[in-house]
């Protein structure tokens, strides 16, 4: 996961990271919900989700249709069990990771409901069982189906296996509603897990990893006898469809479940204050090691069901409940070395090589060190961390399985009398390509400036180069780019942008013909070559955007193209721009530097990124090869349009029925307007279609003019 703060991400970096996060979270959802073999800890997964949500909040225009924030769980993986559509969706819960998060949750409940006295709303608190969510349906008192959560909408029918769990009644007592869906968690007790593993070991079979995965796998057995032998258990805590509600509170419903014969958790209690909830959270945390089942937090719910109804739901979670997660587990080990990894955006990330240690049941050999400052003992705001202690090779360190894809080092334990190693010197060159690694002012991350030549960044750079708003080469999708990049045959490989345009020529005299490779054919290869040839002349702003210069996203590429009009002029400016000397207030930088800063919307950060890019010899070599194949077209000088929206900032929101978002954007720019992805005080006009939500509300709040799509067409004279 990236260590760059969300506020410092460029639009290009944010879009790329959201794409990676969507793929990663979907992958881990499938492993956890559908295949019962997770690769990362719950804390690491939560960190991915939090990072995704933070980026979406900062870049609302980039929210993807397949965003993890709109999805619950994973679709059933195999057709072994028949699908079951839940009468009411089985949603997930939002997470709290601190006392402050819990106070914010309770505060949000009071704010939403409005004008209720303090401490007048009761909340229940119960352990969050680490098992498999299950919905059990009864009709006229008889168990008719059991279904897993699946993706929240559709689960798997595991009725035969559910019937083998002794703690789940096959019949409900007389007087139960005609339709009842009891929901809860199927789990395996720790003691039963240890007994099962001892039995497997005695039989010379492979043992299981943990109780949660074992319970999930046991429930998906084709032979119900196998499920029966695994001694699965159940806690009831929620419900789905009910033809009649037998109680009016959360606690009352759970008590009804107990009376019907379901096991319910004895640690569930009700409180009227945040302090009571937090005290119970800590009490359960203290009792956690002695429990015979795994838990990973405490769930808080508004107790009154009428208030739950008023609070309602977000897209994938209820407003009236939250899961307060337990902190990560820690262990002490030795730091044996520090490796530098180069990410797809050029960030140099230090990774600790550790003496192997078991943390929370997982053997850990590597941990993240975040960045250069973290190793030195400096925090994100320049404050000392770990009491200012730096991290050195040979140190005893505390490792925590927490909010990163790999664990992290959280502290150093200095041993009296033991001589420490030398302070770690962070590299100033990229280990992947040898280019300079620079650190921008105000950033903790050091980045490779190799860009187009760096192998660690190459795949991502080429994907960006051929993307829709850059060179837009049809037939070079994600899979095709990876295929060409990994190809060892010189007649097939694409390692730099210029290689795309020499592919056809290299193929002419090659024995390895592209059309003979699986996935390609004569027709598709011809289309690919035609698509490539169609981009040998390219608009200047697309060319600049395609280079992937840091901070030069689509908007800034257009600003630079309109300012310099030709690539020759832009290149000359980039090579002649010299920033002011650091600390010299009288130095304003070169004339070319001052001219670049004079371009609307281009500040010193963007200008420095351009200068760094062109200052790297490797990049100039790659550009020379590319320009031998491609011609950037001069930009037409903008003339006054006389349009009523000229010079204004426009935001489009909601569903557009007469044009796509790209068409709307192009139309606005054609009339001299600028478009933005979010509403702010700088917004002049909002065009709102059906389904407009937060942006429309923000515009109304700020008093910004709002019109519909038809009025927009009339306004710009294209009706």
Curated annotation (Swiss-Prot):
Enzyme class, first EC level, given as a word: ligase
EC number(s) reported in the record: 6.5.1.2
Keyword terms of this UniProt record: DNA damage, DNA repair, DNA replication, Ligase, Magnesium, Manganese, Metal-binding, NAD, Zinc
Single annotated GO MF: DNA ligase (NAD+) activity
Residues noted as binding Zn(2+) in the record, renumbered to the chain: 430, 433, 448, 454
Domain BRCT: 640-719
One Pfam family here: HHH_2
InterPro entries: BRCT_dom, BRCT_dom_sf, DisA/LigA_HHH, DNA_ligase, DNA_ligase_AS, DNA_ligase_CS, DNAligase_adenylation, DNAligase_N
GO cellular component, one term: cytosol
Domain of life where this protein originates: Bacteria
Biological process, per Gene Ontology: DNA repair; DNA replication
Cited SUPFAM superfamilies: BRCT domain, DNA ligase/mRNA capping enzyme, catalytic domain, Nucleic acid-binding proteins, RuvA domain 2-like
Reaction(s) catalysed (UniProt annotation): NAD(+) + (deoxyribonucleotide)n-3'-hydroxyl + 5'-phospho-(deoxyribonucleotide)m = (deoxyribonucleotide)n+m + AMP + beta-nicotinamide D-nucleotide
Keyword DNA repair: yes
Active site, per annotation: 128
Binding site for NAD(+): 42-46, 92-93, 126, 149, 185, 301, 325
Gene3D superfamilies in the record: 5' to 3' exonuclease, C-terminal subdomain, 6.20.10.30, BRCT domain, DNA ligase/mRNA capping enzyme, Helix hairpin bin, Nucleic acid-binding proteins
Similarity field: Belongs to the NAD-dependent DNA ligase family. LigA subfamily.
NCBIfam families (UniProt xref): dnlj (TIGR00575), PRK07956.1 (NF005932)
Free-text function comment from the UniProt entry: DNA ligase that catalyzes the formation of phosphodiester linkages between 5'-phosphoryl and 3'-hydroxyl groups in double-stranded DNA using NAD as a coenzyme and as the energy source for the reaction. It is essential for DNA replication and repair of damaged DNA.
Protein name: DNA ligase
